[in-house]
Amino acid sequence: MLVCVLLYSFRLFGIQGEAQLTESGGDLVHLEGPLRLSCAASWFTFSIYEIHWVCQASGKGLEWVAVIWRGESHQYNADYVRGRLTTSRDNTKYMLYMQMISLRTQNMAAFNCAG
């Protein structure tokens, strides 16, 4: 099982925090089909933080997938998902979105977001 964890960082204070996140999407999808996830954040000032996606396959360590900065146009994805993964955010709605296209066997898993 591959679990995606939504992380955020407090750059100003140099500490990590926890957010309340509600995920949707992530139902079973077919290979070659798109995977769409969304996370709703609450209680922290979402718009001023960069947001990371980190995944962990069963029995393996954490693996960084993507980051999206405060501005939607600034994002960076890991090489193995580049060109297939898009992240976006709506700061006014405290929402983060991720979509992966052209799923491969190694991508087939349950994705969740958590704080």
Curated annotation (Swiss-Prot):
Keywords of this entry: Adaptive immunity, Cell membrane, Disulfide bond, Immunity, Immunoglobulin, Immunoglobulin domain, Membrane, Secreted, Signal
Ranges where the record places region Complementarity-determining-3: 114-115
Domain of life: Eukaryota
One of the protein's GO biological processes: immunoglobulin mediated immune response
Alphabetized SMART domains for the sequence: IGv (SM00406)
Claim: Plastid is one of the keywords in the record: no
Domain Ig-like: 19-115
Quaternary structure and interacting proteins, as annotated: Immunoglobulins are composed of two identical heavy chains and two identical light chains; disulfide-linked.
Name this protein carries in UniProt: Probable non-functional immunoglobulin heavy variable 8-51-1
Naturally occurring in which organism (per UniProt): Homo sapiens (Human)
